[in-house]
Regions:
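Glycosyltransferase catalytic domains, chiefly GT-A lineage
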Residues: 1-168
Length: 168
């Protein structure tokens, strides 16, 4: 199973917590980490904390995203997942992107192995009426527009590479 994180150095602690929650249910995972500012100490910390898993650290060049708007709430790293199909090795056919502030409470295998049915993504939504109303109000959406949690995205990398135009 391939799992993708997009982080900066401030999120190492949350990343470790998320990985620990994943390991309660699933093993044999390759973690791909898109980053800009992780140093060797950060990488060693993750690898030593989880010696039974494989880490792939992919440094993203800042100039690739220099014109993207950011704020303290929305750092540059939130955009990396949008370009995952270009940033990740061509040998990968799918990957599960997770925000690192997620605590996993069951195995991810069923989600990971879902059939894309020609879709680019499989995403999670909030289906409860309370959450629909809350998200509509918080994000300025109409009540009948579904809210998609972009913090949990199964990506069809083969289809994304074929269909997405980098210029878009």
């Amino acid at each position: 199973m391939n799992i993708l994180f997009s982080i900066n150095a401030k999120f190492i602690g949350l990343t470790k917590t998320c990985i620990q929650s994943i390991f309660r249910f699933d093993k044999n995972i390759d973690f791909y980490i898109l980053h800009q500012d992780l140093n060797q100490e950060h990488k060693d910390d993750l690898m030593q904390s989880f010696p039974d898993c494989t880490f792939h650290f992919i440094e993203v060049k800042e100039e690739s995203f220099k014109d993207f708007p950011t704020s303290s709430r929305y750092p540059l790293e939130i955009y990396y997942r949008l370009f995952a199909s270009d940033l990740l090795p061509d040998t990968l056919d799918r990957i599960l992107y997770l925000d690192v502030d997620i605590v996993v409470i069951q195995s991810l295998r069923e989600l990971y192995n879902m059939d894309f049915q020609d879709n680019l993504y499989i995403a999670c939504s909030h289906v409860s009426e309370n959450m629909t109303h809350l998200n509509a109000k918080r994000l300025g959406l109409k009540e009948d527009v579904p809210y998609i949690n972009t913090g949990v995205l199964l990506m069809n990398l083969i289809a994304l590479r074929k269909q997405l135009n980098k210029q878009d």
